[in-house]
């Protein structure tokens, strides 16, 4: 078998490439030719012209184009090309003259219609001014009027009783059923001023809640009777002093402003039916504000500032009406950082409320395992170190117990923390109490 030399292989590859290039050029030339033929055929079909196909011959059109008809007529009657040019110019001038006449006619018709419309609009405007009416819309069919000043609707703001254009409008008297809803009472064209009963019923529907569904804490000043607007101009409860309904947010449930049916909304000596007073309900709140500077510093974690306030005489263990101190409230809210901060500042650990519940009772009820562990660890460390402050605090609050029995302290119902953990199904807390030597008998 013969072998092929490298030169012959290179020559063969070159010949193949040249042949492929030639085939590509031929294919591209054929493609361009076909595209041109298709474009000419499509143009002839769209313009309905006669087209001479190179292979199919002449393709006759169904109708002649205007240019073809003009050329045929000119070739039959005017074989001279100069005459044909003159005919085309005359035809063009006639067409332009016809278009000019049509445009002039359209402008004339439009001017006449505009004049008629202006005349109608002027007449309509004069009729409106004569009758002192106000129209709305393109055709003027919809009619609006303020009505007679004697039957005008009573508004909340007396300034709104003036006319829109300070005119004495007589047409379109509003119906007596026209009402204006001002939030608390509804007044109409023939309505009476709001009575004391209606206003009180409307106020009773108002509910002032915080974002976390807690009542507001605020002492609202009473508005004098003379500050309320007259009943002839309507009534607005906030027109005298709108700031009376602005309450600052609070997270406590101690002081609340509650509007109820038996709240003294209207005093007996009130002379105006619009004089409303939001009074404080008799709620059981702490004697000291929960958000005092000391409690604010503790909530922010600034124990250094809290110590300065304590050294300056700020109270820490003042109980509220139910006997709960700030430490009791922190345990009830399950705020571990607040409980730890209060204990570090020396808050009374053995204090109980009026029901005899200790911090441990409250922690078991709220199912706070972390606070229970913290209290038990602090109790154990205080017992081991024989903390004098712990015993002093126990004697100070009248608890006739020793520090060793604090974990087994009973409330007024005779329940210990172990009892509560069993009643409330707290197995983890029960194991923790047993670990710290709580009495299970």
From Swiss-Prot:
PROSITE patterns: ANK_REP_REGION, ANK_REPEAT, BZIP_BASIC. Disruption phenotype: Does not affect growth and sporulation but abolishes HC-toxin production and pathogenicity. Signal peptide: none annotated. Residues 14-40 are annotated as: Basic DNA-binding region. One of its GO terms (molecular function) is DNA binding. GO terms for cellular component: nucleus. Disulfide bonds: none annotated. The keyword Ubl conjugation does not apply. Residues 228-241 have a biased composition (Polar residues). One of its GO terms (biological process) is regulation of DNA-templated transcription. ANK repeats lie at residues 289-318, 322-351, 355-384, 413-440. It comes from the Eukaryota. Residues 209-243 are annotated as: Disordered. InterPro entries: Ankyrin_rpt, Ankyrin_rpt-contain_sf, bZIP, bZIP_sf. Residues 212-221 have a biased composition (Basic and acidic residues). The genes involved in HC-toxin biosynthesis, called collectively TOX2, are organized into a diffuse cluster that spans >500 kb. All of the known genes are duplicated or triplicated within this region, with some variation in copy number and chromosomal location among different race 1 strains. Monomer. Transcription factor, part of the diffuse TOX2 gene cluster that mediates the biosynthesis of the HC-toxin, cyclic tetrapeptide of structure cyclo(D-Pro-L-Ala-D-Ala-L-Aeo), where Aeo stands for 2-amino-9,10-epoxi-8-oxodecanoic acid. HC-toxin is a determinant of specificity and virulence in the interaction between the producing fungus and its host, maize. TOXE is a pathway-specific transcription factor which coordinates the expression of genes involved in HC-toxin biosynthesis. This is Transcription factor TOXE. It comes from Cochliobolus carbonum.
